[in-house]
Amino acid sequence: MSLSASLTLTRARTIGAVDPRLYGSFIEHLGRAVYGGIYEPGHPSADAYGFRQDVLNLIRELNVSMVRYPGGNFVSGYTWEDGIGPLEKRPRRLELAWKSVEPNLFGTDEFMHWCKLAGLAPMMAVNLGTRGIEAAGALVEYCNHPSGTAWSDLRIANGSKDPHNVKVWCLGNEMDGPWQIGHKTAEEYGRLACETAKVMKWTDPSIELVACGSSGRGMATFPAWESTVLEHTYEHVEYISLHTYYGNRTGDTPTFLARSLDMDRFIETVAATCDHVQAHKRSKKRLYLSFDEWNVWYHSNTADKAMEPWQVAPPLLEDVYNFEDALVVGCMLISLLKHADRVKMACLAQLVNVIAPIMTDNNGPAWCQTIYYPFQQAACFGPVSYTHLTLPTKRIV
């Protein structure tokens, strides 16, 4: 039986302009993302700051617009003050999220300087797991206030005369997940996020904030979590986050290649929930979505379970990607583009070594994985057009 179909493409009907921040990525203090990834003093390509130039060149060629930092699960136990000031005075800490040791040789100021060299914008997350309002407000002051206060003057003393001017901030990470340090109910998180958002915006009214949405569409609390959180935070945030990862553990290629359809439904459900809360609050404000963790992730699961704990920068989540994975990443990018009217920011998680498009060897070369290339090509796109596909209605048995 032969079937016919027609595809109509028109530039007159656009979904919307693609925000450049749709092509963001993510660096977490996890595995070799930082140490041995973007930062490796003593490497043949490292500059005076310890930043690997071979990695920086690949990142520039990838067209990444923004990078989320420092986590991720890591941020829910992070004391940001540990990562500023003289290196020799920074403490080594047990890092509970990934059972590693954090030397704190790379912190806020190093990240900001690295972002400038890479030509991208920072997206900072604050700790709402073990910390809260005061620490978040202090970090905004440290990063963004010009001078004349304790925190801004400390930034200057640490070598950054000009403010870092971080414009996008995440209010914690995956607080709905039982694995999260300081896990909270939607009610608990919503109240804390609301009050933290107020203090952060009083410190710098120009910033934009991202509330924690569900850590996956399969969570039992989805989408009630979004509804409850937004009832508390709607007027104080600009975005709510979405996270998803897909894998092919059973070798079911057709289902794996279709997983972006699940991503479509995830986006549409969260957007509908946002609109419901907007209507309920009779608000004139429209909320947008930040898909700030997405990727293929499954290859490294077995090896990660066998990893010895309490190492500095152990090789965790080092998936080796194939062509099938690149196809799925390409389909996921199409899902983001199809919803460019609501999804304004997104972060491929992660950027280097950890489920990443770029891999390195310690004291060795850097190279690109298969998923590097669909992202690189998509980052060149502009406005998105509707496509209309007409199929015959006859049922096929």
Residue ranges and their predicted role:
Residues 37-48, 90-104, 124-130, 172-190, ...:
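The substrate-binding groove and active-site-proximal loops of carbohydrate-active enzymes
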Residues 55-64, 111, 132-168, 193-203, ...:
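An active-site-proximal structural segment forming one wall of the substrate-binding cleft
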Residues 35, 40, 75-108, 149-179, ...:
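Aromatic- and acidic-residue-enriched carbohydrate-binding clefts of CAZyme catalytic domains
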Residues 25, 63, 115, 139, ...:
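Conserved, mostly hydrophobic/aromatic
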Residues 30, 290-382:
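Aromatic/acidic polysaccharide-binding cleft in carbohydrate-active enzymes
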Residues 186-332:
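Noncatalytic carbohydrate-binding groove/subsite architecture in carbohydrate-active enzymes
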Residues 387-393:
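Conserved small/polar residues in nucleotide/adenosyl-binding loops
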